[in-house]
Amino acid sequence: MKRASVLVIVVMALLATTAAVLAGGWAVVTLDSPPGEIHAGEPWTVGFTVLQHGQTPVHNLGPGSPVEPLLIATNADGRRVEAQATPTEEVGHFVAEVTFPSEGSWEWTIHPNPLAGESLFEPLTVMAARPAAAEAVV
């Protein structure tokens, strides 16, 4: 009886591994450039490339199976913002736009869904919101 249970567990583990391999495996994300100055309340756009198995730029894993990277950032208070990336014309290249609601340090990562291998980057330092421009007096 125990032997049958172990066999079932082994078969299920092999099937799960096979499904992950057929789904495209894993990927890494490389940024176009280091983040510049970021201010709370202003959109920040980041460009990056998804490299399947760390080498090949990839937009999709086959018909009906697009790569859909998700940027997730969290601050020390636990506040979370997300941005779904959109593909550009260059294979494997994406851009995401996110607006941070407050200043401070934000931990952030990009998940190259449905591929495994989230990429965690150095924390972002978000500056205080810029003062609103004074309205013209008429």
Question: Predicted regions span which residues?
Answer:
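Bacterial N-terminal signal peptides that target proteins for export
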Residues: M1-V8
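Bacterial N-terminal signal peptides
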Residues: V8-T17
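N-terminal soluble domains immediately following signal/targeting peptides that reside
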Residues: A20-V138
